[in-house]
Regions:
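N-terminal glycine/serine-rich phosphate-binding loop of ATP-dependent small-molecule kinases
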Residues: 1-94, 151, 220-225, 387-388, ...
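Active-site core segments that coordinate phosphate-bearing ligands/cofactors
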Residues: 7, 112-126, 139-152, 157, ...
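Residue-level signal for inorganic ion chemistry
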Residues: 24, 73, 100, 141, ...
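Active-site phosphate-binding/coordination module
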Residues: 62-133
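Glycine-rich beta-strand-to-loop/alpha-helix junction loops that act as flexible
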Residues: 76-81, 208-210, 251-254, 389-397
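Nucleotide/phosphate-binding loop and acidic/charged catalytic motifs
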Residues: 100, 172-178
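A charged, well-structured terminal subsegment
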Residues: 133-139
């Protein structure tokens, strides 16, 4: 039987299982989408019971089939999600949706007693995002659902809850508590004092390569504590680039620049410019810039396609014009992004009248996006830093125009494409390598 590490990779849309062999190649994978249900307030949420059953059945089926010997299991999930347990260790809440609206005025006392919204957000590296801050979720349950709160004995972030299903151990990890939770004091690298003031006790985080031995369906298996997916995605490149500082540009709907080498604490200027911090499994801050630029690109691709009557993916077939790139850099015009970037961003159709061709419009759009990306990278780079490489992962690493503009606007660094697939799952697997 082939020895493997099983990874449960939970996204908002797809729930996946991967098996990695001793060379960290994927030898099996499976995925499933789940219908949402309603929480106790009637708001849509993931069906945690169905997800639990699926995970446990997947592991059991692999064991029974006999083709693979599972030596370790680990978990990676999206952030901003908590589960609450009672004294009997039973889950007493649904998996509340982090998109659920909250009135931040209900928490003004927390901010007021801890230096105000700006200072509290800076210190915890957590912009005031409502439900996206799991610390705020805790206070919301405490204030609005006392019947539930009075039963709470333990609070787990999503990855640690999945680990708990197999180990029955209450754990925490640095990547989860460090992901815009408003519970972690990044100045002192410990839990923030407000938790003690509110009589909220959270488990001390452990390092990501620690595991608990558990008997699962009669077999001894090392079970990791799990980790946050964004932090997990940077682990494979950290392993590859030992001794070299780099920034990872994770590109999708959001373009997130992640710098795991920043030593400086988050500033108010950075916070106001869409910067925050994550943490590595070893308790190292990952200063990050998070911008909604992928969405802008997506919206204007549709407008360009309609206006110039071409295929939606025409941009991928454009012949790279270095001369046009340099011409636009010299002109330094702002056409598409003269206003702020909102999450409900809509295209301005009339702008396209300025352009004689699809190519000229698309190049201008990407130039402006790249300028924003470079500003984000510069914001998260320490003054004395020696960043030599920018890795691009996600959809934009196939975009020749995007890569060319980045190279021209940031000539001091080498632009590389991340060839790693399933980065989050691989990162979680690498942490379990000692148990293979």
């Amino acid at each position: 039987m082939k020895k493997v590490i099983a990874i449960i990779d939970i996204g908002k849309t797809n729930k996946k299982l991967f098996l990695f062999d001793e060379k960290f190649n994927v030898v099996f994978n499976n995925s499933k989408k789940f219908e949402e249900i309603k929480d106790d307030d009637g708001f849509p949420c993931d069906d945690i019971e169905a997800i639990e059953n699926w995970i446990q059945n997947q592991i059991k089926t692999i064991q029974e089939t006999g083709n693979f010997k599972i030596k370790a299991i680990n978990f990676t999930t999206h952030g901003a999600s908590l589960l609450f347990l009672n004294k009997e260790g039973k889950r007493i809440t649904p998996l509340y949706n982090y998109l659920k609206p909250l009135n931040l005025d209900d928490f003004k006392n927390l901010y007021k007693t801890n230096g105000g919204v700006d200072e509290f957000s800076r210190k915890t590296a957590s912009p005031a995002y409502g439900m996206l801050n799991t610390g705020i979720q805790m206070l919301s349950i405490k204030a609005n659902k006392p019947r539930i709160w009075n039963q709470v004995d333990a609070i787990l972030h999503y990855p640690q809850y999945l680990s708990y299903l197999f180990t029955k151990k209450i754990t925490a990890d640095f990547t989860s508590v460090g992901a815009h939770t408003a519970t972690w004091d990044f100045d002192n690298m410990q839990y923030h004092s407000w938790l003690k003031d509110e009589n909220i006790n959270l488990p001390e985080p452990c390092k990501g390569n620690e595991a608990v031995m558990a008997v699962i369906n009669g077999e001894n298996i090392a079970v990791g504590t799990g980790l946050h997916d964004s932090s997990s995605s940077i682990i494979p490149i950290l392993a590859k680039e030992k001794g070299n500082d780099f920034v990872l540009l994770s590109t999708g709907t959001w373009i997130i620049a992640m710098n795991p080498f920043s030593k400086e604490t988050l500033t108010q200027e950075q916070l106001k410019n869409n910067c925050l911090c994550f943490m590595t499994p070893e308790k190292q801050q990952v200063k990050s810039s998070m911008q909604f630029l992928g969405r802008i690109h997506e919206v204007y691709l549709k407008e360009l396609s309609d206006y110039f009557k071409v295929d939606l993916n025409t941009h991928l077939d454009l012949v790279l014009s270095n001369a046009l790139c340099n011409e636009l850099i010299d002109e330094n015009a702002t056409v598409f992004l003269s206003e702020g970037i909102d999450t409900d961003f809509e295209a301005h159709h009339e702008i396209l009248n300025k352009f004689p061709s699809y190519e000229s419009a698309y190049y201008q759009l990407v130039y402006e996006i790249c300028k924003k990306v470079i500003l984000g990278i510069d914001l998260i780079t320490d003054k004395d830093a020696k960043i030599t490489t920018v890795y691009i992962s996600g959809g934009f690493n196939r975009n020749k125009v995007f890569v060319e503009f980045l190279s021209l606007l940031k000539p001091s660094v080498t632009i590389k494409m991340s060839d790693v697939k399933n980065e989050s799952a691989l990162g979680a697997a690498l942490l379990m390598k000692n148990y293979l």
